[in-house]
Amino acid sequence: MIEKLKSVEEKFENINAQLCDPDVVSDIEKYKTLMQEAKHLTPVVEKYREYKKVNADFEEAQALLDEGGLDKDFREMVQEQFEQSRDDLEKIKEELKILLLPRDP
């Protein structure tokens, strides 16, 4: 799933770059097609970027917990962040699965 999301994000970035090209802007049909595709990809890319941020938070919390040597209060705070990030990741993964489903024609 992650490879698919990386591919979608790359495609989105490519489309956005094309939309800035004066040749594309002057070709109304191509511009319209690219805008529609960008509109379709935007929710997937936004959710994927959210996933990457939450995953980084999760990994950071996990690394801190694995290090040990944390005082009790800080460890509790990191543990809460770890659990919240883990729960958020599961939710985001489910949302991404839905967003990646083929759309109806």
PLM regions: where:
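Charged, heptad-repeat coiled-coil alpha-helices that serve as long linker/dimerization "arms"
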Residues: 1-105
